[in-house]
């Protein structure tokens, strides 16, 4: 980036943020003393050395172990060498002697080895081995390894959370030009975690981080410019930031389909997290294994898929995946044959890359009409892997697979028409197939749709649509793996570690993370923020989630204004948010709350008839609302009757009705009958 342009952008940021009162309102509520951001290098090292001597950082255990394995193996993994005091001494010498700064070949090699392990496997045992190598590399002055260790302190990896130590190490690394450290300091400043809450400073950190190459900073800035958070809303600037990240993600996805991450919503089942459908329960997993060994082919294929990509809380394990696929393939499963072909086509530790073997299994699956097998053969011919390049054959197989609804084949057809590979360029057909594939969540199809909308290729240009699509692609980055580690941390009771991971994802624009962070803050279990900060920050995050379409968050904002949590009581604003949730999202809770406000005239004009209508709508919208609505209506009718008794002249009414002369001496039986009929009507509504 041009230095002058960077300086101008920073000045604009400072000017805009100084006009924003969010930081001022928030800082007035801060009472605790924040850690200064200007700490000398020697003090940093002295502090870290003290920590190690006290034993606060020398027992590093793996608290992120997969719960499925943890229930069977209760032992804890330990990283050897993390307690080595030489790490701090060498780092201290490294920073104090600029002339002698150098990353040794051995340290660089150790870091590369650790990084390779993380890229090739997602198992916790392998992660532990990787961090052991990072520790040794950091001992030798490797800056990237130091970044890894600072991250471990920040996020509480392996039970070693120490935010103060992380901040001081980040500050030292930032002075050496580390863009990851710049991003981390920006994140901490934006929340006021261990540092002063300062949005202007956070934006400056993010700007320098993005200029240095931080994809996270790029994504954060994209989200801020898209939503107008402490900057002037600017779709084109957001597009520029998001596109850079999306290009990076698309390049990774073209080499691998990536690993989908389960984004568990803490707001849905807070009382029973172990039953969450996004995470496979240990007992159910054991039952599936039993069925698979008994010969259940469908279960064998399912377990193979789960282990292949590491879903539902299971570790990625290529050996187990291949084991189950081979058993199912032997029983004649076309899907299993296709997945075996896929494993050999891509290559991994259990199934080394082998085009001939891939062709064999893809052909076996395709002969049974399997869409995955047909798509696999198309890929072999398209790329010329083990066979000559033949776009005609590739097109034929892609079309057959696409007709069966396989999204990857639909994407490949779209790409052929988009790029003109073996066919005439046809942007309308390209858009058609990209759109079809995107409906199933195919990430590269979403990326190319974003490209078309961003450039106006084959469609009318739309910045907003392009940004939303790019944002979806960006959220498939490797950083999304923190959803799983944050969830396990929360489940294990490590609330601070969970919160800080969700908070970073929330800062990057993930709506689920914004809701989860607000939920944790609202529970008042977090210790990394002062109690006076919890509700204001939770309100801020609920608001961001609501803007992204979360109905529950919208109702929460109404609740905060109704009760005065983190803000002043404001019934009118509460009613506004309840109305939005009721009208736009059809929220039964919002309808009920709004009905109550109309019933009592809180923030809006009292309207009994509208209150009745909203209560009825709430009952019709959600079965769970039937009982609360029944009692609310009973109370409303009772109060209405008492009101009539107190404020109306019933003598005149009875005289006007002339019940004795009109109905006869048994008029009281008629009234009783009417009351019984009304009760039957109410009971019918209750059970409807």
Swiss-Prot record:
GO annotations of cellular component type: cilium; membrane; nuclear speck
Glycosylation sites: 34, 162
Subcellular location: Membrane; Cell projection, Cilium; Nucleus speckle
Cytoplasmic topological domain residue ranges: 684-688
SUPFAM superfamilies membership: HCP-like (SSF81901)
Keyword Lyase: no
Keyword line: Cell projection, Glycoprotein, Membrane, Nucleus, Repeat, Signal, Transmembrane, Transmembrane helix
Leader sequence segment: 1-18
Membrane topology: Single-pass type I membrane protein
TM regions (residue ranges): 663-683
Classification via SMART domains: SEL1
Record topology, Extracellular segments: 19-662
Main location: membrane
Stored Pfam families: Sel1
Sel1-like repeat residues: 107-142, 143-178, 179-214, 215-250, 297-333, 334-370, 371-406, 407-442, 443-478, 551-586, 588-623
Gene3D superfamilies: Tetratricopeptide repeat domain (1.25.40.10)
InterPro entries: Sel1-like (IPR006597), Sel1_AlgK (IPR050767), TPR-like_helical_dom_sf (IPR011990)
Similarity comment text for this entry: Belongs to the sel-1 family.
Record-linked PANTHER family: PROTEIN SEL-1 HOMOLOG 2, SEL-1-LIKE PROTEIN
Record protein name field: Protein sel-1 homolog 2
Species this chain originates from: Mus musculus (Mouse)
Gene transcribed to yield this protein: Sel1l2
